[in-house]
């Protein structure tokens, strides 16, 4: 990872990620399409549950980023023992996180939903969906920990295979469990949740199968479970800021749902649909950033600073190109995109306006996402968190609150692109300063 030409290396690491994340985003959209066929109320229930579900995923992925960064850095420095200790501690802590998330998420969900709606049918649907999803939280945590471990050692094709297998099975199970088939009864929104959990379980099975039959540079070992407070501190030092980076959108969605609900429930539905579409539009770029992250960590550990700089520049260019394509899709295909999720003319009209405004910030957002990912790879979790705080808290919340008073609900949509422009002005100097200290 420190000798191969940078561009082919980045492409070889990123391409499996891009493919797997495209499949994952396709699953998210297909899953929502099936739920939307149940009713618009079912889609609203998913939109309301989304912030807590996203927060749980943020813990899994964010802590996994810490595992990934530490393994890659220790391997780059030639310290296999430390890399294995980081992997083992990371897996054990991930399992603990999963148990806690299951208990806490199920406990708080009824009260959380009642903050946004008094409709008992919506609340019941949200509780049904979330309870089943969070019962699989520990399985999801273990799967994502394995994903980051395989990525750290350059086995991107394994993570691609595991994710695609789980997502395809999920997509196939959705119509069967939601609407019923033969002896399988129609389960409605509960079927969508169960299909998601089974898909996560099957992805984990792929990782376990490959791990048991393949020689890897890093193994999970009982001998590495001995307490190591210094290592755990470093894992959380990278993982906690990464978790906050990923969890901040949940806080943002909760805040924006509160603003938009004051106009009509259709705006809440549109925001939920946008975030489903956002996974499809952003995940290819995020796949490139994921491919960059272990490479930057490895080369930083090996003191190859010129390669670190080149990796950042190439990732930025590739991400911006992908987001330019996303902008064109939203500008010229906003109507058919919305029609995938709803037949309500009012919701479609609101969604068209929202997509055409929000997408104005897509290209410039590449600066923030690339800088944040590079900083995580360098182990600069705090600096990465600064960028995310700007994107999801410090800029957009005040802007949305102020602009909606002058522009109505459209003010919320305008807050998105203005925030991306302001965040880019912060992100690049923060990255340059951090690299200067390396």
Task: State what each model feature region is.
Residues 64, 133-151, 159-167, 192-205, ...:
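Short runs within selected transmembrane alpha-helices of multi-pass transporters and secretion channels
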Residues 43-103, 140-154, 158-159, 257, ...:
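Small-residue-rich hydrophobic transmembrane alpha-helices
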Residues 55-58, 102, 170-175, 204-208, ...:
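Hydrophobic transmembrane alpha-helices of multi-pass small-molecule transporters
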Residues 1-14, 71-138, 184-240, 296-361, ...:
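Short alpha-helical transmembrane segments in multi-pass integral membrane proteins
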Residues 17, 21, 33, 69, ...:
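Transmembrane alpha-helix boundary and packing residues in multipass membrane permease domains
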Residues 22, 26-44, 113-120, 176-187, ...:
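Helix-terminus/linker motif at the lipid-water interface of multi-pass membrane proteins
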Residues 2-33, 37-38, 54-66, 70, ...:
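N-terminal transmembrane alpha-helices
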Residues 11-31, 132, 166, 199-203, ...:
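Transmembrane helical elements of multi-pass membrane transporters/channels
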